[in-house]
Swiss-Prot record:
SUPFAM superfamilies: Cysteine proteinases, LysM domain
Chain intervals for the UniProt region annotation (Disordered): 229-291, 347-390
Protein source organism: Listeria grayi (Listeria murrayi)
Keywords assigned: Hydrolase, Protease, Repeat, Signal, Thiol protease
Organismal lineage: Bacteria, Bacillati, Bacillota, Bacilli, Bacillales
Residue ranges annotated for the SH3b domain, each copy included: 78-142
Residue span(s) of domain LysM: 28-71, 175-218, 297-341
GO MF annotation, one: cysteine-type peptidase activity
Enzyme category, top tier: hydrolase
Signal peptide residue numbers: 1-27
UniProt protein name: Probable endopeptidase p60
Ranges of biased composition (kind: Low complexity): 229-257, 264-282, 347-362, 372-390
Keyword check for Repeat: yes
Domain spans labelled NlpC/P60: 393-511
One GO term (biological process): proteolysis
Amino acid sequence: MNMKKATIVSAAGIAVTAFAAPSVVSANTVVVASGDTLWGIASKTGTTVDQLKQLNKLDSDRIVPGQKLTIKEVAAQKVEKSVSATWLNVRHAPDANEKILTSLKGRTVVKVESSEANGWNKISFDNGKTGYVNGKYLSDAKVAAPVVTKAVTHKAEAKVAATSTHAVKVDTNASTYKVKSGDTIWALSVKYGVPVQKLIEWNNLSSSSIYVGQTIAVKEAAAKAAPTTVKQAAPAKVAPKQEVKQTAPAKQEQAKPAAKETVKPAVSKPKAATPAPTAKPAVEQKASTPAVDTNAATYKVQNGDSLGKIASLFKVSVADLTNWNNLNATITIYAGQELSVKASAAKPKPAAPAKPAVSKPATSTPAKVTPTNTTNNSTPTTNVNNNTSQSSSASFSALYAEAKKHLGKPYTWGARGPSTFDCSGFTSYVFNQVGLSLSGNSATQYANSTKISESQAQPGDLVFFNYGSGIAHVGIYIGGGQMIDAQDNGVSIDNIHGNGWGQYLVGFGRV
């Protein structure tokens, strides 16, 4: 009988040993072994059954072999990650519909404070501010480097400090900022806490390109005033000077012979340069001419003008000017050229596309007619090539008008519209809205399009990009080296050769 009891006790001891020996994976987790119970694991690891159930979100005491259990809550550790997208919006809360605090450029290293259940990460800046970004656009940082925003901010502050201490005081409260060498639209976005898209909108920029000496509105209050200044300055400097050039030489040539021919040829040069005083009334005249400039339907190009300058002057986009004036992709303008600056004055499209209707009978006639109509046979060939695009010519106006409706809408991977888009979802939606068939992702759209060179590209064609693993982005070409597309910052207009796009450009496709 005693031997029987000893056997039972011995077996019980073995059972207890089995229950108390879960497989320890790390200091914070264990893997359940056969025969384990929550009570046994709690006793072994110095915790309680309730704590185990809470940490592992268990509704009952039931566990199964192979199940991994957390036995200790791990304190969140800050890790550094790198932005893998071209641009990444930082938002007020972990949701794509929340307010944008700023935007981070690709490869920026950020500190991740914590991760949310929906995949968003809370990040922090060196100034103590925090925000949220979509975790799928972050990758492990290979080198623990300081956050790029810090470097840019210090660089900007160092430059301002070197210029003057007064500039530093005005910096945070200023409503405008004068661009210095090394500045980028993104750096200004971080410095003033304004989204890149807002800076582009407030300053009537067609892309995120800026130049040294340019005055940028960094507060919404200055956005309305900035275009007015440009409007008044442009006519004053250019238009009156042309009139002076036409009339002043006549006066100078007549006055010189009458007074002193040989004695003061050298002095006459300063006199030729003295039209500066006559230009002063022109500066004062600025106040009397803005009404004509803003209401005019056409504008005569002056020396030093560019499409970007004219677009800012009349509050339109570069794409509008190219469309209204039937400009080529090269967008070359010249002094004296008259441009339509309002849709009501848009120049009619070339009548060439109507010729194919005549050419069809010519191509179907017997071979005998071909020799006699050599000119007619060559013309349709050119016209047919020009009409291979569904979206060319008359269709582009409708296509571009539809695309512009969605400017500023947020980007969501896989979204097909109309409230949010990814790149191929945007192109498909816009094309289909105007009756042009387009579907699939960016790679499919590339495969199904007719490949053309940049010199052949017309507004309405598609433009494609490859980040290294195949076609990964598509936009709608609008001419002048620009496209309208859905990217990380939402639907916007971008320069296909600037701001990091050029190195990934693959080519153009016609649908």
